[in-house]
Amino acid sequence: MSKIVVAGGTPLYGDVRISGAKNAVLPILCATLLADAPVEISNVPYLHDVITMINLLRELGAGVTMNEGIEAKGRSITVDPRWVRQRVVPYDLVKTMRASVLLLGPLLACYGAAEVALPGGCAIGSRPVDQHIRGLQSLGAEITVENGYIKASVSQGRLKGGRFVFDVVSVTGTENLLMAAAVAQGTSVIENAAMEPEVVDLAECLITLGARVEGAGTPRIVVEGVERLKSGQYAVLPDRIETGTFLVATAMTGGRISMQQVRPQTLDAVLGKLTEAGACIEIGADSIRLDMQGRRPCSVNLTTAPYPGFPTDMQAQFMALNCVAEGVGVIKETIFENRFMHVDELLRLGAKIQIEGHTAIVQGVERLSGAPVMATDLRASASLILAGLVAEGETIIDRIYHLDRGYENIEKKLGVLGASIRRMT
């Protein structure tokens, strides 16, 4: 099993290219099933979850080709949905990735039936699919859960437009309903919709392919269904969580970094907290520069919340920052009930963290000490790498398959910035 070895103590300097967003490309790949001709998606990151989704699409019968592209634009994937015949998404492929549930809406909407195994993925809390099911039922779907599968059908041949109010904000629930509504008969209204940039990116992709969508990025999305989407090309937005992770890494190590082709407007909450921590940040239309040369960060307080609040996917990275910051930082997790699993591993490195329910109180220390640690989920693995970058000695991070689900070549990108980091098999 692969491990990552980090030797701390080197500030990060230089430029880095941010990959396409994992949480945008997965629903967009699912959305290609709504088209009646090939669709090309560019700026696709090479991630374990992306490969899993490609395998799922192929299992359904879709033709999928991957083009390496050029460094500046990333890979492209062309999906030809015209050969889809299968309606069952098997557990063997679904078990490692929660986003597989996003195939439910497109399959049901286009083919009138779908069976999707209940999904797997990171073990960071209960993320039930009941909102997906109730949303699709509001469009006329008949759904049961049997033997570990969500079984859905449409008795009248085509989903009908309807109105649905989410009980709680759900990103993937919003995406599933949005895709299904795009080819439903009539107008659908989605209330209390997720406002994340990845939802907006999906909507913009659907519009590019011929969908009629208004209000994406607000709590109310209106979709006027069309019969089928068309062929087209779309570029995935840059990954805001990868962007934030590299910014935090640079702030922790006292370095300087420049990023091009990013979306600063999707990172307001993160950039605000980095400024509070003492970083000097310059923002352009599609660029970010952060300078923390020779300075120790200050602790920050934060509470995770749905967008545009502070993203839960950046909580672990900021906890790592608070571990070596000056002062005491308080972190409240409100999205997932089990997302402090990285704390025990940070404690092994010498961090001072006290957990009180859904709150972590972090007393910054001047230095951490390298030690063997174990990744427990995707973002926790990133936080351990960040901690290793500032720890004395070597930090060996085990179970990094979590990392490969969401970060493309993170050790190579950090190495270009000057980090002493390598993958060991």
From Swiss-Prot:
Protein name per Swiss-Prot or TrEMBL: UDP-N-acetylglucosamine 1-carboxyvinyltransferase
Modified residues (2-(S-cysteinyl)pyruvic acid O-phosphothioketal): C122
Annotated binding of phosphoenolpyruvate, by residue: K22, N23
Cellular location(s): Cytoplasm
PANTHER family: UDP-N-ACETYLGLUCOSAMINE 1-CARBOXYVINYLTRANSFERASE
InterPro entries: Enolpyruvate_Tfrase_dom (IPR001986), Enolpyruvate_Tfrase_sf (IPR036968), MurA_subfamily (IPR050068), RNA3'P_cycl/enolpyr_Trfase_a/b (IPR013792), UDP_GlcNAc_COvinyl_MurA (IPR005750)
GO molecular function: UDP-N-acetylglucosamine 1-carboxyvinyltransferase activity
Cellular component GO terms held in the UniProt record: cytoplasm
Classification of source organism: Bacteria, Pseudomonadati, Pseudomonadota, Gammaproteobacteria, Lysobacterales
Substrates-to-products reaction catalysed: phosphoenolpyruvate + UDP-N-acetyl-alpha-D-glucosamine = UDP-N-acetyl-3-O-(1-carboxyvinyl)-alpha-D-glucosamine + phosphate
Binding-site list for UDP-N-acetyl-alpha-D-glucosamine: R98, R127, P128, V129, D130, Q131, D313, I335
Family: Belongs to the EPSP synthase family. MurA subfamily.
Function statement: Cell wall formation. Adds enolpyruvyl to UDP-N-acetylglucosamine.
Protein encoded by which gene: murA
UniProt KW keywords: Cell cycle, Cell division, Cell shape, Cell wall biogenesis/degradation, Cytoplasm, Peptidoglycan synthesis, Pyruvate, Transferase
EC number assigned by the record: 2.5.1.7
A Gene Ontology biological process term: peptidoglycan biosynthetic process
Annotated active site: C122 (proton donor)
Pathway this chain belongs to: Cell wall biogenesis; peptidoglycan biosynthesis
